[in-house]
């Protein structure tokens, strides 16, 4: 049985656009890239270089944000587990009101 080859493409996540600093950095970067393209002797090469560098930057940013989100979820899960254990160890209905 032949296995189909699967191509995985990275898609730009719109989550970083929720941060004003990121949007302003993108705007400044685009303006600089536009200026460089206008002055370049070989705009196609400059464009592909800028595109690959920008893609790498966005991939790294996306990876960092996902890592931070996973860390927050892990801490919240641990906190919830501790609260759940304390709830089960408490005796009586009056003690359960605290939780």
Swiss-Prot record:
> According to the lineage, what is the superkingdom?
Eukaryota
Coarse class of the primary localization is secreted
Q: Where is this motif: RxLR-dEER?
A: 35-55
Q: Which UniProt keywords apply?
A: Host cytoplasm, Host nucleus, Secreted, Signal, Virulence
Which residue pairs form cystines in this protein?
none
| Segments traversing the membrane | none
What protein family is recorded?
A: Belongs to the RxLR effector family.
Q: What is known of its domains?
A: The RxLR-dEER motif acts to carry the protein into the host cell cytoplasm through binding to cell surface phosphatidylinositol-3-phosphate.
- The molecule here is called Secreted RxLR effector protein 94
